[in-house]
Design a protein with these regions (language model features):
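Intrinsically disordered, low-complexity and often Lys/Arg-enriched segments
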Residues: 1-9, 77
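Long, charge-rich, low-complexity alpha-helical segments
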Residues: 31-78
């Protein structure tokens, strides 16, 4: 089984090995990107997530979701 490598634009995310354990975070926040996926998995709507994590913009969240969708749709993963 092949795995998807998701390329995320620098205007959406940042990572610093010295901060937050090197976790990938939304740009200009300390909110880890994986928090979005965890919340969606738990049944939280995107609107609720954005209300709870005010520093994350809708454009950032949708951009991350679109990048993940694109990576998972790659025919080379079949």
């Amino acid at each position: 089984m092949k795995t998807a490598a998701v390329e995320l634009p620098a205007d959406l995310v940042w990572r610093d090995p010295e901060r937050l354990g090197g976790r990938l975070c939304f740009r200009n926040t300390r909110v880890p990107v994986d928090a979005l996926f965890e919340n969606l998995e738990d049944g939280v709507s995107l609107a609720e997530f954005l209300d709870a994590f005010e520093g994350v913009t809708r454009e950032q969240a949708v951009g991350v979701l679109e990048a993940a969708r694109t990576a998972l749709a790659e025919p080379s993963l079949a």
